[in-house]
Curated annotation (Swiss-Prot):
Name of one Pfam family that matches: Ribosomal_S7
The organism of origin for this protein: Roseiflexus sp. (strain RS-1)
GO cellular component: small ribosomal subunit
A GO BP entry: translation
A Gene Ontology molecular function term of the record: structural constituent of ribosome
Name of this protein: Small ribosomal subunit protein uS7
Keyword line: Ribonucleoprotein, Ribosomal protein, RNA-binding, rRNA-binding, tRNA-binding
Keyword Secreted attributed: no
């Protein structure tokens, strides 16, 4: 075991528009090559478009989409006696949010033909309604964990 203490996680300051740490983390994930102002513009335009289409507050749409897209259980490889088993483990809330935001962004980037803010808005709306590529990814991860339930006893030590 390492002798040094655990590192305290740095939480970014909340974003100026919605005063939400979660939105700021999402902006940081959208950001490429340090261009934060462009990332903010994309996220805010996507939020405005989603709010306009669903006629609900943008922050509520985003938080519900992240909640819907986050997996409850996932598999982690564990090596036991020369064999590697996929052991189902519960996902902690921080990782659940992080995975959900990452998957939302990946699914939005995988869509084609429209500006990024429109693709992101469409993916947020789909996740809000429990449909789309992000939700399919979550269900695949959870199905994999369910299929490997027999190995869950390896995760308890």
């Amino acid at each position: 075991m390492p002798r040094r203490g655990t590192i305290e996680r740095r939480i970014p300051p909340p974003d100026p528009r919605y005063n939400s740490v979660l939105v700021q983390q999402f902006i940081n994930k959208v950001m490429q090559r340090g261009k934060k102002s462009i990332a903010e513009k994309i996220v805010y335009q996507a939020f405005d478009l989603a709010a306009q289409r669903l006629k609900k507050p943008a922050l509520e749409i985003f938080e519900t989409a992240v909640r819907n897209a986050g997996p409850v259980i996932e598999v982690k490889p564990r090596r036991v006696g020369g064999a590697t088993y996929q052991v189902p483990v519960e996902v902690k809330s921080d990782r659940r949010q992080s995975l959900a935001m990452r998957w939302l962004l990946m699914s939005a980037r995988a869509r084609s033909g429209k500006p990024m803010y429109e693709r992101l808005a469409a993916e947020l709306i789909d996740a809000y309604n429990n449909t789309g590529a992000t939700i399919k990814r979550k269900e695949d991860v959870q199905r994999m964990a369910e299929a490997n339930r027999a190995f869950s006893h390896y995760g308890r030590f």
